[in-house]
Structure formats: C-alpha cells, structure tokens
Amino acid sequence: MRFVAGDFYAGLVEGQHLDAVYRSPGLSPYAIAPVLVAAHVTGTRASGELGLYVQALDALRTARGYAPAVLAITGTNGKTTVTSLTGQLIEHAGKSVAVAGNIGPTLLDTLSAHLDSNTLPEVWVLELSSFQLDAVNAFEPTAAVVLNVTQDHLDWHGTMAAYAAAKSRIFGQHGLMVLNRDDPAVMAMLPEPVKVKLQRPQVRAHITFGTDMPQRPGDFGIEEVNGMVWLVRALEADETR
C-alpha cells in the first residue's frame, strides 16, 4: 500500500491502473475534484462507504437471497434521535434490527459483525449524513426520510442547493419518500408527476408529516382535542368503513 501526502491531483489516478477509488466522507468534493474527474475520465469506479454497503447487500442478495428492509434517515437536525427511536420501535415490534451509519457504529463494521455472528437482521435503520450521501448513486432504500434542511455544512457543499441535493440522494429512484411538509426545501425533493398516455400522471410514492392536520390519505399530522395533542393519520376512504 502506498501513502501519499499533500494535495489531491489527477496523477493519483491517471496511469495507476486502479480498480476503484474510495473516498472518505470527511473529504469535500471540491478538495478531491481532480481525483474524481480523473476517475470518471479513466472509467475508474468512484465510491464511498455507503456504496460499499450497497455492493455488499447486492452480493448477499445474489448469494443468499438476503433482502432486508432498509430504512434511511437524514436531516440537518434530529436524525440521530429519530434513528435511535426507529430502531427501538422495530425491535419492540419483534423484528431483528441493526442500527448503523452516522450514529455509529459504521455501516461496514456493523455488517461485518452480523456476518461473523450469522445474525443478519430483518431491518436496517441507517442514519446518513450529507457527506455520506454526496458520493452515492445506486442506493435504493425501502423507505427514507429527510427530516429538515437548514443552513449547515456550506463550507463542505458550497451552496444550499448542493447541500439539499446531497440530502435528496437518500431516496434513490424507487423507495417510499417520507417528507416534512412544513419544510419547503424537503417538499421540493418530490419529483414532478410523470405524464402517462391515457392515464393520470403518476406521482412518486410518498407520505408526509407535519404539525398541522393531515389532508392527504396516509399522511401524518398533529391534532389538539380538549387540551390533548394527538399524532393522527389521514385514512383512506375504505379504511373508515
């Protein structure tokens, strides 16, 4: 193994015959841009810990048929609390669960430990930071939530738009989106409906939550009745029969 100190430059990749480049989430995309560009030009795969985790799950699915539910959580504030509570709720529901990611321990350490002990869980609950999400392209959770987006880490991302874009990668292309309808930056992550010939436009599967009463079936909100505050969910019409 060769260690290199100093600035990142294209020569670290060009002509090196590398199989892949793996980046630490602590390195901003601007600092390592020459390396990432060189990797793209040379066709060298670039990834990070989350990408390796995705690869590992894909390999386990092929080899063992292992297909756990993956719940992913991010947001500027509150993600550690929500991750911890989600893990506890799933455990109390009788499911085996692993909680990992930004909350600690790391994704790969947790996966390795479960492989060693032959205790692969039914559900993964992942706390993911914008740093981890910035580098991922093929992450497809079962469901994911962005709790909120407020100004933070602009020294790393450069702009609020780039920061929000990194957060939005948590949803992948197919997973259920769980959105904070009180936060315009989060709601802006919902894709526009897809027009389909002779059919209604198709809306990406999603539910929302907020501090007001929910109006859309499946959404969650808050209702105050006789001085008591309740968490409520709007029902489908046939659920009330």
Q: Which stretches of residues belong to each language-model region?
A:
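Short beta-strand elements of ligand-binding domains
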Residues: 3-6, 47-50, 208-211
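Internal gly/pro-rich beta-alpha loop/helix module
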Residues: 3, 189, 193, 206-209, ...
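Short, surface-exposed charged micro-motifs
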Residues: 219-221
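Phosphate-binding loop of NTP-binding sites
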Residues: 12, 16, 25, 29-202, ...
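A short, charged helix-loop
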Residues: 237-241
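Basic, alpha-helical nucleic-acid-binding regions used in initiation and control of genome expression
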Residues: 20
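Short polar/acidic secondary-structure junctions
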Residues: 138, 213-214
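Glycine-rich, highly charged phosphate/nucleotide-binding loops
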Residues: 2-14
